[in-house]
Amino acid sequence: EISKRDVKDKEGDLTREPEMVKAYRDSWYLGTHSYASYLVDRLRCGREMLAETGSIFLQIGEENVHRARQIMDEVFGEENFISTIALLKTTSNTTRFIAGVYDHLLWYAKDIRQVKYRQLYFQKDFGAEGALEYTQIDLPSGEKRALSILEKRGASDLPEGGRVFRLDNLTSQSRSASTAFSYFWEGKTLGPGAGGWKTNLVGMNRLAAAGRLRTRQIGNTITYVRYIEDFAAIPLANMWTDVSSGFNVYQPKLYVVQTNERIVERCILMASDPGDLVLDPTCGSGTTAEIAEQWGRRWITIDTSRVAVSIARQRL
């Protein structure tokens, strides 16, 4: 019951009902109806326990993501929806049609006006995600050229001292008095078009002095040189392709519904600070508690199965 306050956590208070052999499998006697009822009860209870700055994450497959989203909209309110994060899997069930390789992570806030959020970043590496548009190189001699196919693939070393760069847009859709002006460059007077430049006249002169300006022939406008090290990180977005649930020798999959540790880690880091309290109402083997402990969060983990509780207790 949601309002029940006399819950005990001693050994004698755990259920004495016979355990199923499939201790880590989800089983629903009435199918979708059982699942929906289970979800509503636990989400309502979870919302009651959340801090005003708190978040809730629900990982789910494509079969029921639409049902779960509808239920969470009802319990938390549509206005408190934050994101649906796509989680890449390495395998999919055999099917006659297109293979499904994504799970979904639904993210809601208790109060979106107060929710705690900490932006995470990836390191921007040449040739990797977030850096594929860096296709030119600035050599110590002053020569600037396009990277070769072998250099782009990493099959050939980059010249020593070379700096990889891309040509980036210097115009903005917004327009103000300080950014709407014509600029004389390489014998031409060029304007920003219907919008404005991304910087003022002082900034343009600074870019020119640093050798950062280039003329774009298509569109007859000015671009600027952005080196890959200018901002060596890219913000984490809602497509996670490096959290494959296929697992490997370093992180073997031991249970049917086991979650990749990296997913849990990111959720904790995005939505909490050290000292905050993390709750996992479907304990399993205790992965969430272990990650929370590693990152200095307090934690509570619970499960209806004595098998899960016993394994988690030994692990932790």
Feature map (PLM): residue ranges:
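Conserved SAM-binding loop of SAM-dependent methyltransferases across substrates and taxa
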Residues: T287-R297
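Class I S-adenosyl-L-methionine
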Residues: E1-L277, V309
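Conserved SAM-binding motif I beta-strand of class I
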Residues: W299-D303
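Class I SAM-dependent methyltransferase "Motif I" SAM/SAH-binding loop
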Residues: T282-G286
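Short, conserved SAM-binding/catalytic segment
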Residues: Q294, R313-L316
